[in-house]
Amino acid sequence: MASSSISFSCAPSLATSLFSTTSSSPRLLSSRFLGTRNLKLRIRPARLGPSNGSRTTCWFKFGKNGVDAENAGIYGSQSRDDFDRDDVEQYFNYMGMLAVEGTYSKMEALLNLNIHPVDILLMLAATEGDRPKIEELLKAGADYSVKDADGRTAIDRANSEEIRDLILGYSTQKA
């Protein structure tokens, strides 16, 4: 995959909002947030934009020389203990389970069994067939053999053979 860098020009609508248009005197644009290279540039609101010679670039990079989400600690680098009850509730809401169930009683029942939140999330994700979430949770150390109140595991709750195979396949890769 080819690496690329991303650069932005300072948009007139953004920059003009930084200045008072009632004053006719030019002002200095020296924002570290915008990352402008020429900090001695005097800017009049009427001339603000890419044609004034200023250039703004992002301070983050993607691709070969950048950082991916997993190494940045954003996705996939969580451990079991990084998940808590709030994550279970947020996922329950996000996946529309509250709308379907009409109550938090099933979620609360799972939480009251003293099952670790990451294992509850795996059961819910398997029920929904949420492949990316299942992969994330298995990487974090979720245990697919934990049973719910009905004695069902994440494998039992999986909504398709593909999801069962994903969970079982991860367990054989890990071993």
UniProtKB/Swiss-Prot annotation:
The keyword Protein transport applies. The keyword Mitochondrion does not apply. It is a peripheral membrane protein. Highly expressed in leaves and seedlings. Detected in roots, but not in germinating seeds. One of its GO terms (biological process) is intracellular protein transport. ANK repeats lie at residues 117-149. It is found in: Plastid, Chloroplast thylakoid membrane; Plastid, Chloroplast envelope; Plastid, Chloroplast stroma. GO terms for cellular component: chloroplast; chloroplast envelope; chloroplast stroma; chloroplast thylakoid membrane. It comes from the Eukaryota. PROSITE patterns: ANK_REP_REGION, ANK_REPEAT. Keywords: ANK repeat, Chloroplast, Membrane, Plastid, Protein transport, Thylakoid, Transit peptide, Transport. InterPro entries: Ankyrin_rpt, Ankyrin_rpt-contain_sf, LTD-like. Disruption phenotype: Not able to grow photoautotrophically in soil. Pale green, slow growth and no bolting. No appressed grana in chloroplasts. Induction: Up-regulated by light. Residues 1-68 form a transit peptide. Involved in the import of light-harvesting complex proteins (LHCP) and subsequent routing of these proteins to the chloroplast signal recognition particle (SRP) pathway. Interacts with CAO/cpSRP43, but is not a component of the transit complex. Interacts with LHCP (via T14 domain), TIC40 and TIC110. This is Protein LHCP TRANSLOCATION DEFECT. It comes from Arabidopsis thaliana (Mouse-ear cress). The gene is LTD.
